[in-house]
Amino acid sequence: VSISDSDYQGRFTIPTPKGVYQAAGDTNINTDYAYLAQNIRTERGLLASSYGTSRAFPALGAQIETLARFYRRTRPDDADVYVAAAGGAIYTYTMGTEGWVKRSEGYKSDVWSSVTYETTEGGATVDILILSNAKDGMIAVYGSDLRVEKKALTIGDAYAEVKFATLGRHAERIWGTGAEGYPDSIFYSRPYDPFNWTNVAETPELGGGVINQPTWDGDKFIALEPFGGYLLAVKEQTIFEIRGTDPSSFTITEAYGTDGPVEERSICTDRTSMLYLSQNGIGLYDGNTLRLLSRDALYETMRMRMEGMDGAARACVCNHIYYLAMCIKESESDVLSENNTVLEYDTERGTFMVRKGMRVKDFFSVGGTVYFTQADEPFEVLRYGDPESGGYLGAPMECLWETPWLDLGKAYMKRDFVLRFTADADENDVPVEMTIKTERREKTRVVLLQRQRKDYRVKIQVSGVRMKLKIRSHAKAAGWRIYGGVQAEYSLDEV
C-alpha cells in the first residue's frame, strides 16, 4: 500500500537530543531525553555514536596507577613529558620517543597525588612535578633532566615524619593532608618554597604551618581541591572551605555535610562545581548548596549499583564533563568485581550519558585529554573519547538511544510511521537499526549510512496506541551522526 504524505495527521520530533532522564517514569517525558541510552553523543544538536578508544602510549610492563604530565611553563616548545607510577617505580615518557624510561624505584605505593610547580636551579627556573603518598612521602621530578629526588620536608620537630597522601596548590603554596596519625591536620608550605613547611616567627605571612580541624567523629581529610579563589578540604562526611591569602588571613569553615561518606577517588572539581559519589548518588557542591544529581535523573541506572563496590569507583573531570566509572548490574542477579559502566555528566548542559563496554580501572585527566587503564589490560594506557576512533580499539561498540513510551493522544491508534533525518558516517554502509515498538509488537528497519551526508526517509508499518523509537548500532567500528534530530510522522485512526 503506498502512503502519500497528505495522509499523515500526526508527527513528533526529537528536536535537540540531550541525554538520559529517568526521573519521571518511562512515559511521555520530553522527547529531547532518552529513557535508556548508551554510547551516544549529543553535543551541539547531534545524535551521534560516542567517540571510541585508542592506545595512547607504548605499553609499560607493570600496572600504571598514577599518570601525570609536566606543565611546560618555562620551556613551552619542549615535547610533552608524561610521568607514570607502576610496579614501585617512576617512569617518564617523552612524546615522540620509543617508550617509557625508568627514573627511580623502590617505592611502596603507586598511588601518588601530584601538583605541578617550579623551582630555581643554577639561577634558571625549572618546571617540577611534586608527588606524594602516605607511605613514601614526597618526591619531585625535575623538568630539566627528568631526574627524581626524594624530598625530606622541613616541617619542625613536632611533625618530623609526616607523609602526605594528598597535595593541593593554593595561595602560591603547596598544601598537604592525609598523613597517617594526623587525620584532622592540613599543612601548608612557605610561599614559593614547596619543600619548607616551617613557620617564620617574625613574619608569619612568609611561613608554613598547619591548620587543625577536628570533627570528633573518626573522620579524616581525604582531598584538597582548588575551587574558585579558595581551597576545598574534604572529609568523608563534611566539606570545609579554606580562604585567605596568607597565614594571618587563613580561615577554615565548615561548608556542608556530604550526605554520607564520600568515595575518595570520585572527588573532582570543575571551575564552579565539585562532584563526588556518595551512598545516595552523585553529589554536586557549587559553593553554596549541595545537590544530588543522579538520585532522580539516573534513578533506574543507580538502582542497579553493585553493593559494596563503590570503593572501586574512579572519576576525573575534563572539558566540563565529569566521568565516573562504576559497577552497574545488567540484571538483579549479576555479581560484578570491576567497573563496567561510565557515567558522563556535562556540567554546562546538566545532562547525563551512560557509557558501556569499557572496564575502567583508573581514570586520568591530563592536559585536556582523558586517559584510562582497563581492568583486563592495566599495563596499557588508553585514550578515552578519541575523535579518530569509532570503536573500542577497533571493535564495534553498541550505541543505543531509546525514547520513553509516547501515547501522542490516547484516543488514537497510530500506524504507518515515516522517520525523517539527515545523517552521515565515518565509512560507507554503516548499519543503524531504526525500530518502532508499540504495545502490540516492534518492527526494525536497517539503514545503511554513508560518508556523504544524506537525507533519509524510512517507512515502518506497525500500529499501536503507544509507541517508542529505538536507534541502535553495533555492527561496525565506525562513527555516525544524525544532524538536527529525528522527525516521525504517522497516520491516526480513532480507537
Per-range role (PLM):
Residues 78-81, 127, 225-228:
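Membrane-entry segments of alpha-helical transmembrane domains in multi-pass membrane proteins
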Residues 84, 114, 131, 140-141, ...:
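Short beta-strand element of the conserved SAM-dependent methyltransferase core
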Residues 87-97, 139-143, 181-204, 241, ...:
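Short beta-strand segments and strand-loop junctions that repeat across beta-rich extracellular domains
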Residues 117-154:
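Hydrophobic or amphipathic alpha-helical targeting/insertion segments
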